[in-house]
Amino acid sequence: MIPSFAVGRTQEMLYFIREIKAEHLVHGHGEFPVYVDSPLAVEATNIFRDHQKECYDSDAAALLAQGINPILFPGLKLSITSDESKAINFNETPKVIISASGMCDAGRIKHHLKHNLWRQESTVLFVGYQPSVHWDGR
């Protein structure tokens, strides 16, 4: 599970996950699905798709020139509805879930943590800023 900010960070993670999958760096699980589970993150990803010149840097543009989409790849699943979100947790195959709320204080990531954090094979990968003290003092 990757708690991530919906705009920018999610798309950056998709870029790196596409590279990991393309280089076959996850031995034994090369075809693992990747879920983007956030309506806002899905919309932002669609904006990146539709406005490639404005959104991509030179490395991503070079991939596009080769016919490779830098953030969309086989096995990527974009989840918008709450039913789609809930269904992710019933599928027990190895997967990556990128869900909004980079600080885990709101949104669907809380649902995924509740249903998966207890599982020994689960990992939470923090890819953004985490303050030592929450805004409300926790």
Regions inferred by a protein language model and the residue ranges of each:
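Acidic/His-rich, metal-assisted hydrolase cores and their charged scaffolds
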Residues: 1-138
